[in-house]
């Protein structure tokens, strides 16, 4: 029993000891847990401070890098960099950039909603030049032993105006006209006679009811007549001829009017204007060889394309030098053209900016190309170019050829053998260009010379075929600023500025008007349309206004080229002396064509 109690006490003691041990271990474990938690708290606080320190250091480094990037200059632009920049500009169309690549010229002319090759209004107008019942025929009014001789002046087309006006002057003076003499001594140095360029028989026969015309001056009782040589002022009207030339003609029987170009006023009575048209558009035709060769050139252009443009391009060194225009060629251009300009000792010092601002500078080949593209003509269009020597040669023509690769001339579509009968004579070569330009679907010019004016009038008379003359006064600023705008903006402005310069019917002629350019008296309208007087809106240029415009707005067609280098201006005053006893030099269109 005692042994059992003893064992029971030992068991109870053992249990108590294990319990105390567990309690002690629990305390130790709790303490270790508290210690671990405390250590974790300490470590978290330490880590936060480290991260704060690292963040502060990183922020300082970022600030330093930003300051460095702002204050350091940009790297030098390389060609590769600029090329990449331009490609970005092309994609985003950044208008503010001044780089040329912003001004992208399309290859297509676009769809402008109008017909490029004709006018939809032309069918309502037609040429009409028949004489009225009041117009006396030649057999009733021509006086016997009264002969008028004419010496023309300038290039082919300037001489053409003289021939046309000579017929009218003969009618005014009731005189017999002797076939006019062509100019063999001007800048062009062409020895061709009238019969070698124009059809004499047709000229005489078709005008037989209007004016008596002889090929040669007849002899006076077996002796040769001695004509009185005279010179009349520019724009001389009917009264001028009747009061100043007719008395001399009655006394001497034969009068020769020299330097006869633009010697007849634009303002004549309607029957005289219609006579001008009968001469120009029906009687004055080229010889058969010229017409046949011209027909061959036209057929070859038609074989290349259904429609084609004819461009009369005047950009000769002499003409540019005289005009005083500057085209950006630097000292080389100034030196070369300046040396040529010294031929004319009386020329004043040029102001290129003023000349161009007034619209007196011919457009460059590139500018003509840009204008045509803006008007809707794409790169697939074929162009026949009538031109002389182009200043700068192929380098000057390159931009135009890039815009219109289908670039032709009589030299490229005809052989040397075919052109041989004409190539030694500037007048006959000019006649070939005249024929092709006249038959083209669209005629374009970069100048306001004689050929441009003559053909503009002819194309109006025969159906108002499109004839594009650049509005140089407006376009010059546009060409200067073209790199500061998009192509669409440029093209829109070109089309706006060219309104009234496209050869459309009812165009109001801006500024002065040459009758040969706008033969309004010879253009009639179909029934149901307003009369020609009404369509002019009552605008009429008086004699005084005409004279003022001639003096205030001269161009190179009013310039006299003299072998001695002298130049003089003749005032267009109908009261100036008719005769020129001392042979003083006067105006002649050196830059006539």
Regions found by a protein language model. Give the residues of each.
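N-terminal targeting/anchoring "stem" of glycan-biosynthesis enzymes
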Residues: 2-593
């Amino acid at each position: 029993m005692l042994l059992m109690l003893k064992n029971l006490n030992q068991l109870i003691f053992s249990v108590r000891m294990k319990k105390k041990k567990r309690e002690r271990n629990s305390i130790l474990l709790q303490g270790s847990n508290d210690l671990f938690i405390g250590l974790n708290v300490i470590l978290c606080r330490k880590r936060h401070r480290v991260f704060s320190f690292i963040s502060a250091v990183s922020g300082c480094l970022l600030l330093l890098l930003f300051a460095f990037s702002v204050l350091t200059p940009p790297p030098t632009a390389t060609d590769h960099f600029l090329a990449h920049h331009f490609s970005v500009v092309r994609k985003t169309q950044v208008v503010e950039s001044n780089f040329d690549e912003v001004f992208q010229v399309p290859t297509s002319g676009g769809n402008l909603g109008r017909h490029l090759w004709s006018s939809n209004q032309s069918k309502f107008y037609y040429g009409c030049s028949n004489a009225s019942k009041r117009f006396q025929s030649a057999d009733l009014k021509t006086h016997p032993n009264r002969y008028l001789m004419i010496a023309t002046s300038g290039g082919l087309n300037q001489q053409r105006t003289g021939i046309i006006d000579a017929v009218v002057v003969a009618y005014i003076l009731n005189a017999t006209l002797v076939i006019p003499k062509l100019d063999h001594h001007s800048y062009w140095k062409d020895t061709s006679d009238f019969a070698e360029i124009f059809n004499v028989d047709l000229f005489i026969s078709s005008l037989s009811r209007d004016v008596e015309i002889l090929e040669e001056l007849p002899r006076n009782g077996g002796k040769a007549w001695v004509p009185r040589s005279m010179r009349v002022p520019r724009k001389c009207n009917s009264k001028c001829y009747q009061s100043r030339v007719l008395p001399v003609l009655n006394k001497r029987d034969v009068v020769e009017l020299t330097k006869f170009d633009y010697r007849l006023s634009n303002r004549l009575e309607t029957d005289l204007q219609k006579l001008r048209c009968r001469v120009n558009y029906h009687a004055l035709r080229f010889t058969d060889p010229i017409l046949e060769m011209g027909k061959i050139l036209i057929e070859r252009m038609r074989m290349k394309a259904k429609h084609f443009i004819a461009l009369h391009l005047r950009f000769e060194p002499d003409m540019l030098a005289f005009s005083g225009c500057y085209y950006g060629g630097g000292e080389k251009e100034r030196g070369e053209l300046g040396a040529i300009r010294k031929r004319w000792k009386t020329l004043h010092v040029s102001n290129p900016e003023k000349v161009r601002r007034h619209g007196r500078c011919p457009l460059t080949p590139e500018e003509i190309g840009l204008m045509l593209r803006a008007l809707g003509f794409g790169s697939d269009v074929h162009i026949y170019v009538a031109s002389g020597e182009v200043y700068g040669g192929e380098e000057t023509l390159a931009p135009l050829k890039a815009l219109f690769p289908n670039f032709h001339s009589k030299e490229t579509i005809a052989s040397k053998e075919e052109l041989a009968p004409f190539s030694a004579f500037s007048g006959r070569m000019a006649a070939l260009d005249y024929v092709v330009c006249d038959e083209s679907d669209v005629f374009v010019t970069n100048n306001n010379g004689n050929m441009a004016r003559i053909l503009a009038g002819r194309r109006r008379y025969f159906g108002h075929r499109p004839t594009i003359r650049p509005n140089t006064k407006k376009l010059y600023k546009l060409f200067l600023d073209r790199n500061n705008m998009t192509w669409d903006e440029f093209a829109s402005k070109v089309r706006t500025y060219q309104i009234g310069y496209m050869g459309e019917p009812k165009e109001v002629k801006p500024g002065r008007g040459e009758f040969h350019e706008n033969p309004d008296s010879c253009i009639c309208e179909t029934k149901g349309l307003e009369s020609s007087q009404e369509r002019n809106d009552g605008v009429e240029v008086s004699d005084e206004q005409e004279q003022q415009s001639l003096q205030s707005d001269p161009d190179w067609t009013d310039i006299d080229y003299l072998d001695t280098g002298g130049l003089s201006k003749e005032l267009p005053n109908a009261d100036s002396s008719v005769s020129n006893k001392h042979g003083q030099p006067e105006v002649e269109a050196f830059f006539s064509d």
